[in-house]
């Protein structure tokens, strides 16, 4: 017989209170497809009130026993959570920050399958930041989401205090401080881009409304599902109570791809490349800015003297990297996208190194570059590490950049016209050209 010691909450015993949160720790409590896995609460223990949870070595589940007058049953002292919650862990948790709630949509998809385990490990928000994961799926994926939750459970992450799965964004987004919106319909063969904008736009309009109603008022939202700039715009327009500044479209993967290509050409390790801006849309019109990027602190054009390659080979390789990868893999980037989501969030929760910046798709109102207001456009940003950011204001734009930035801007304006019915800006009119409106994965 192995013994694991558990601490009970200082307040009323959750084991005695049928409506307590811990009641939900019984696996897969299901209400309207909203299911909840939960660890014991933090900072609510006293060393004097302990429960012993005894585990038979050859039985499947631990059996809680009574101590200090507190009643426990096998059902309430739930499986792995009993085993992982011991006094030593509790000592460590004393210095932990207050738990934060993180929603992830498309949680049964490829990108999430990489991302969720990074979030739970502490790699993103830090080793003293406990988290609750709120996973949004659909009727299609609810079974798979249970599988995801089980894998998270089996990973024994100390910082992962709670896992909820559900299909209703109004429930899943309740009190979330971060929302990572990945779930979106992929473009199928023969599908018009306007149709994709409409189908995915509806998803992001609904999720914007739900965030507006249920999320923490200062929630930070990172839109990954494509076309991510316009989806982010739809989302923010449907969430008027949340600052527009809090919405991001993921262009960090493009930034990382650009750094990699420059490092390769210059023959340096990629950590030597800094100040990399991606301007514009996450599409083949995006502009990887080699004018302002630096290698070993020097302007790229001084280090790489083949300027034709910069203007053509480099630029195109970044714009079309996603498509090439699909050709090789047979599916779009998932692991590197998850890594870039981690990078994007870390850039907001840690101070930007002196003199450097990062790229993210943000709302253009008040931008110093003359880019049309009312778009979500990738630009250079800096953060103090408080979750917020400022636009970098003094980046040089030459004629080459200006022309290409204008093309991406025109593309986003066209996308915006296609979704006017979803942003509350009138009747949609879709005049997207066939060539200039490709996702990176469509080439
Ligand atoms: N911004 C960027 O840099 C990148 C963006 N992407 C984009 O990220 C998104 C997700 O990619 P990935 O995880 O690989 O994709 P997957 O297809 O593996 O999973 C995405 C999830 O989207 C949801 N989904 C699929 N079809 C529909 C639909 N018709 N309606 C609503 N939801 C749907 C599904 O979840 P459920 O059934 O639970 O709703 C699915 O699990 C895609 O839009 C992709 O283009 C990809 C790479 C880079
Ligand atoms: O088009 C896609 O789905 C893939 C994508 O965004 C990328 O690889 O950058």
From Swiss-Prot:
CDD domains: MDH_chloroplast-like
Enzyme Commission number: 1.1.1.82
HAMAP family: Malate_dehydrog_2
GO cellular component terms attached to this protein's record: apoplast; chloroplast; chloroplast envelope; chloroplast stroma; mitochondrion; plastid; thylakoid
Family: Belongs to the LDH/MDH superfamily. MDH type 2 family.
Covalent cross-link site, Glycyl lysine isopeptide (Lys-Gly) (interchain with G-Cter in ubiquitin): 213
Binding site for substrate: 187, 193, 226, 257
Source organism of the structure: Arabidopsis thaliana
Main subcellular localisation: plastid
Listed GO biological process terms: malate metabolic process; response to redox state
Induction remarks: By low temperature and high light.
Pfam family, one: Ldh_1_C
The organelle targeting sequence, given as a residue range: 1-52
Function according to Swiss-Prot or TrEMBL: The chloroplastic, NADP-dependent form is essential for the photosynthesis C4 cycle, which allows plants to circumvent the problem of photorespiration. In C4 plants, NADP-MDH activity acts to convert oxaloacetate to malate in chloroplasts of mesophyll cells for transport to the bundle sheath cells. Plays an essential role in the regulation of catalase activity and the accumulation of a hydrogen peroxide-dependent signal by transmitting the redox state of the chloroplast to other cell compartments.
Regulation: Chloroplast NADP-MDH is activated upon illumination. In order to be enzymatically active, disulfide bridges on the protein must be reduced by thioredoxin which receives electrons from ferredoxin and the electron transport system of photosynthesis.
Cellular compartments annotated: Plastid, Chloroplast
Site feature Activation of NADP-MDH, where: 77, 82
Keyword Amino-acid biosynthesis: no
Disulfide-bonded cysteines: 77-82, 418-430
PANTHER family from the UniProt entry: MALATE DEHYDROGENASE
Positions of NADP(+) binding: 106-112, 200, 207, 224-226
UniProt catalytic activity: (S)-malate + NADP(+) = oxaloacetate + NADPH + H(+)
Subunit structure, as described in the record: Homodimer.
Name listed for the protein in its UniProt record: Malate dehydrogenase [NADP], chloroplastic
């Amino acid at each position: 017989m192995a013994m694991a010691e558990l601490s009970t909450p200082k307040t009323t015993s959750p084991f005695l209170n049928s409506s307590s949160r811990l009641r939900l720790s019984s696996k897969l409590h299901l209400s309207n497809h909203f299911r909840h896995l939960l660890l014991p609460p933090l900072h609510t223990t006293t060393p004097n009130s302990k429960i012993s949870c005894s585990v038979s070595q050859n039985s499947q589940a631990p059996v809680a026993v009574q101590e200090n007058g507190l009643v426990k049953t096998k059902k309430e002292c739930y499986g792995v959570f009993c085993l992982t919650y011991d006094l030593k862990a509790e000592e460590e948790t004393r210095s932990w920050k207050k738990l934060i709630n993180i929603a992830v949509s498309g949680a049964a998809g490829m990108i999430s399958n990489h991302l969720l385990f990074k979030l739970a490990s502490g790699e993103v928000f830090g080793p003293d930041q406990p988290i609750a994961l709120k996973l949004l799926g659909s009727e299609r994926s609810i079974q798979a989401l249970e599988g995801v939750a089980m894998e998270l459970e089996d990973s024994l992450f100390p910082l992962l205090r709670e896992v909820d799965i559900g299909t209703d964004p109004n429930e899943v987004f309740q009190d979330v401080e971060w929302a990572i919106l990945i779930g979106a319909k992929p473009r199928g063969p023969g599908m018009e881009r306007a149709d994709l904008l409409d189908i995915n736009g509806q998803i992001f309009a609904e999720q914007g409304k739900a965030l507006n109603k249920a999320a923490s008022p200062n929630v930070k939202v990172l839109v990954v599902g494509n076309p991510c700039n316009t989806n982010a715009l739809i989302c923010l327009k449907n969430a008027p109570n949340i600052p527009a500044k809090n919405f991001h479209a993921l262009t960090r993967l493009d930034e990382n791809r650009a750094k990699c290509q420059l490092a390769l050409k210059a023959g340096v390790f990629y950590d030597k490349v800094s100040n990399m801006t991606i301007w514009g849309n996450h599409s083949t019109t995006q502009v990887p800015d080699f004018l302002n990027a630096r290698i070993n602190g020097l302007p790229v054009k001084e280090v790489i003297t083949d300027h034709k390659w910069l203007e053509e080979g480099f630029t195109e390789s970044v714009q079309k990297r996603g498509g090439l990868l699909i050709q090789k893999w047979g599916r779009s980037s998932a692991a590197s996208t998850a890594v870039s989501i981690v990078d994007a969030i870390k850039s907001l929760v840690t101070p930007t190194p002196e003199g450097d910046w990062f790229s993210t798709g943000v709302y253009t109102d008040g931008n110093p570059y003359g880019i049309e207001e009312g778009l979500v456009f990738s630009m250079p940003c800096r953060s103090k590490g408080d979750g917020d950011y400022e636009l970098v204001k003094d980046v040089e734009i030459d004629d080459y950049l200006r022309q290409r930035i204008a093309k991406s801007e025109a593309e986003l304006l066209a996308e915006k016209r296609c979704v006017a019915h979803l942003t509350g800006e009138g009747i949609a009119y879709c005049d997207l050209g066939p060539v200039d409106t490709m996702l990176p994965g469509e080439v």
